[in-house]
């Protein structure tokens, strides 16, 4: 590069340096002016009013969000409760009907106990078949007979009518069944009425 070119280059750089310096000063002045204009705007009454409105709107939005969360939780609880009630209605819907039929089963059992096998064997056989059909029909609806003779007393399924000493029987065991119990699925419809042995 010739000396003349170097001088020209230096001159060009210096001129541009001055231009950049002037541009930077102008930008700084504009920034200062903007900040001077902004400072009074923050204290302006309309700005304060807008800030209060924004705060109130944020509070209202938060309240509405909390309400919606609570409403969704309540809706979920109602849905679960309804599902449980529908399932129970399907499972235990026949409970009233079965409770109404239990006295018929009791009457058939008493008739079988009182019928003399020697007097009329066909009648005894007919009662046995009727009883079997009845119990089979109940089993189709998940009804189970509770006949606890010889078992340990269970207050969840048995109702103790009295307690008696019973030689040879373990204590707290069922020695006599007055009336058999019934349960539908896992729910006891009627507890078995029993006499329990003492020590």
From Swiss-Prot:
It comes from the Bacteria. Keywords: Chaperone, Cytoplasm, Stress response. PROSITE patterns: GRPE. One of its GO terms (molecular function) is protein-folding chaperone binding. InterPro entries: GrpE, GrpE_coiled_coil, GrpE_head. Residues 1-24 have a biased composition (Basic and acidic residues). Signal peptide: none annotated. It is found in: Cytoplasm. Gene3D superfamilies: 3.90.20.20, Head domain of nucleotide exchange factor GrpE. GO terms for biological process: protein folding. Residues 1-52 are annotated as: Disordered. The keyword Chaperone applies. The keyword Nucleotide-binding does not apply. NCBIfam families: PRK14139.1, PRK14140.1, PRK14144.1, PRK14150.1. Homodimer. This is Protein GrpE. It comes from Legionella pneumophila.
């Amino acid at each position: 590069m010739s000396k003349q070119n170097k001088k020209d280059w230096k001159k060009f750089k210096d001129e541009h340096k001055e231009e950049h310096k002037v541009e930077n000063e102008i930008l700084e002045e504009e920034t200062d002016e903007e900040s001077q204009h902004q400072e009074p705007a923050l204290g302006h009454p309309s700005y304060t009013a807008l800030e209060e409105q924004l705060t109130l709107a944020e509070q209202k939005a938060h309240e509405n969000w909390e309400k919606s969360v609570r409403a969704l939780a309540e809706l979920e609880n109602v849905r679960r409760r309804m599902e449980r009630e529908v399932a129970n209605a399907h499972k235990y819907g026949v409970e009233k009907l079965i409770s109404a039929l239990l006295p018929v089963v009791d009457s058939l059992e008493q008739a079988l106990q009182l019928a003399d096998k020697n007097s009329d064997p066909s009648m005894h056989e007919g009662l046995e078949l009727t009883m079997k059909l009845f119990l089979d029909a109940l089993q189709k609806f998940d009804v189970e007979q509770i006949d606890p003779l010889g078992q340990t007393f269970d207050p969840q399924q048995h109702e103790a009518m009295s307690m008696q000493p019973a030689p040879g029987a373990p204590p707290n065991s069922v020695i006599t069944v007055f009336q058999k119990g019934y349960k539908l699925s896992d729910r006891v419809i009627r507890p078995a009425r029993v006499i329990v042995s003492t020590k």
